[in-house]
Amino acid sequence: MDRSLDVVALGEAMLEFNQTQQVPPMYLQGFGGDTSNAAIAAARAGARVAYLSRLGQDHWGHLLMQLWAREGVNTTGILQDPQAPSGVYFVSHDGRGHHFSYARAGSAASRMHSTDVQTHWASLIGASQWLHLSGISLAISPSACDAAFAAMHSARAQGTRIAFDSNLRLSLWPLDRARACITEAVRLCDLFLPSLDDMSALTGLQQSDDVLDWSHAHGARLVVLKLGSEGTIVSDGQQRTRIAPHRVQAVDATGAGDCFAGNLLARLCRGDTLEQAARYANAAAALSVQGHGAVAPLPLPAAVQALLQP
């Protein structure tokens, strides 16, 4: 089969308004949505990328289409919905970190449905090396969850590998449902990208080795556990390697995990081992926290290579 794409990602893209000043309040307009951020990060890293979603036929949706065109992301899989809006979110900052407020109820992306996969997306999934999804892809609505699982089953049937990022947002769904759906996604995926915080909330496990054991026991062949400021741990089920963080002056960590995921997949498509790809993605994510917003600070390869130079 022709693998004309490296990564297809499925989820919800949104307009972002990121706080740059508290008094008086000022916000910088940008773009977000975890899997869209990851898709753009992968494209900037040189991957051939497509995005799968629904958008409103509104100004916000038009801006997102322009963004993907600028970034070289294939939009064949974007379905425009005249009956629902595109989603919007706000990011505020304080001494405890960054906080999100969403205006996404009833969004076009929440109207994704399992029939969209067979009707519109199966061929794109089959043309790609990787399908990337997240916990948010599952959480935004029951029908979107059905679409995400249909996409995963389509990927497995066509030999496309699946990467799944935990991205737990308990504001979107109850813990019991999140636990059940994410556990099933782990069973289906080839590469699981959890954070320690997410897995502690989902499973009650506090130690990284216990989380890695749980992940492999529930079906994930490869796991990259994100530890925030403590770096990452890469595991193939036999060997575990800790990758130290890069010390940088963090301004806004909004899309750091998405940057990590996109760069990791892009490097795997270029032939890196999982450890090599994770070291590259670790550096890219460190660079991404030095600017405001989820998309604008996503680095290009030259900057990542410069940080990796001894």
Q: At which residue positions do the language-model features occur?
A:
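Glycine-rich phosphate/adenosyl-contacting loop at the front of the ribokinase-like
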Residues: 1-74, 251
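Conserved phosphate-binding/catalytic region of the ribokinase-like
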Residues: 1-8, 153-157, 204-310
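General beta-strand structural signal in soluble alpha/beta enzymes
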Residues: 9-10, 77, 163-164, 193-194, ...
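Short, conserved phosphate/pyrophosphate- and ester-handling motifs at nucleotide-, phospho-/glycolipid
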Residues: 42, 195, 257
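Conserved N-terminal subdomain of the carbohydrate kinase-like
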Residues: 48-135, 306-310
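Short, electropositive alpha-helical surface patch
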Residues: 61-73, 155, 179-188, 248
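Structural alpha-helical scaffold elements that stabilize or flank donor/cofactor-binding regions
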Residues: 123-124, 184-185, 216
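Conserved beta-alpha-beta core of the PfkB/ribokinase-like small-molecule kinase fold
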Residues: 130-213, 230-231
